[in-house]
Amino acid sequence: GAILASGGDCCMTMAREVAGTEQDFLKLMNKKSEELGLENSHFADVTGFHHDDNYSTVKDIAELLNKALGKEEFYKVFTTNTYTTTATEEHPEGIELKSTLYKNLDTFEVTGGKILGGKTGYTESAGLCLASLAEINDRKYILVTAKADGNLFTEGFHVTDAVNVYEQIGKSTK
């Protein structure tokens, strides 16, 4: 739920499960950020919502994503389009979670390859953002974009930006 459906509630629950409190989880996040050498990032909110002391750069996010994609379980979640949860009494068929990336894409295909996965984001100050992974001409690319026009209720300009960049990569690397 934290990645596919972009659920802030899932992030808060995960933080409490891992560290006991959201504040303790933030301490872990900032410690890991330092260990990874993310010099322009500081986390002050586990959901990613706006907070004056919560900031990063596209470079740092790309470095973080690159490290995370090296973990098999994260790679699997990040590149999943839909996932159905285990059935419960309240939801006998489970709950289908869909990646927020794919609601903005008609096709995953781009020249020479395809978009494998991504995580969307939005705050008023950061605009529409996207961290994505594509494979083009047998090579993988990470792209992080920010400050795209629009909001959660408009066209996905952050996704359009990524598709355009990936198309150019595909055309130039044939």
Which functions belong to the PLM regions below?
Residues L4-E17, A44:
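Substrate-binding clefts and substrate-entry loops adjacent to catalytic sites
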